[in-house]
């Protein structure tokens, strides 16, 4: 009888272990490089010991390519920008609707939440919610370029050989706005948009002698700014915020036509297998102390109410040095990218690269 009891107990333990293994879950996260800091991942796994987080770092183009290749399989939570969801899903069927009742949306900034919902609603279903937001614009060393505030200043002969830019779609859009155009409105008229691109290409080719170098990564840009090789550049705001901590003369400058604003989101891949874990992660990073840790990692601002107050002190100082209330009101949010636009922009950029000798 004693042996029987021990055997039963042993079987029960094995069975319980099997159940535990069966209940274990993996959250496969497809995200940007700074959106899954090790400290937060560890903290999440400690709170939910039945969930293991696997992180794949990516960008907008790669996210679409990876999910397109698998039909939305291989990942449980993705973080595309708000303007890269609608067209990608309509074309490739890679996402599934979100259950907003599972998300603490009441802590989100209503303007950002409503904007993302509007951009990602398809057939009455919402496909994303906001995570963090930031901008692209200009950066200047105010001790050397105190009046720098227009996209066109990058090409001002006053700063010949002392400016930089990255040959990506942001500079095309910035130049378009500086020419008095609204490129986002022109998305609805591809002929009009091509005219705008042609003018931007001519302008940027003519600008090449003003450019010290075309930056490709944030580290390249930071080195040029800190060394004084350049006095201003087109940039992500997060790069400028980082440099502000090393030299308070280097500040992010919202262009006079408005900084270009993006919102990175949370979206569920169509064949994801861990929706509950995904919702837990979303709610976890919305908690105030985790918002601060995330912003410290990313340099971006959370899409929650009171986000400015939750920034680490150094980031808060950099943001306050960059933005006024009017600058915030003047933000130009990236619009949904319809099919065909990226191909047009890619060809425009190739023309500039060929003419300027940039790779």
Task: Show where each model-derived region lies.
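Ligand-binding "clamshell"
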Residues: 89-97, 122-125, 242-254, 317
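A ligand-binding cleft/hinge motif common to bilobed small-molecule-binding domains
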Residues: 83-87, 232-249
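Early extracytoplasmic/lumenal segment of secretory-pathway proteins
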Residues: 25-88
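Extracytoplasmic ligand-binding site segments that recognize negatively charged/polar headgroups
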Residues: 74, 82-85, 89-222
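Mature extracytoplasmic/periplasmic domains
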Residues: 260, 269-329
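Periplasmic-binding protein-like
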Residues: 197-207, 245-270
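A bilobed periplasmic-binding-protein/Venus flytrap-type ligand-binding module shared by bacterial periplasmic
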Residues: 137-144, 176-178, 263-274, 293-294
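Conserved C-terminal helix/tail region of periplasmic/extracytoplasmic solute-binding proteins
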Residues: 325-359
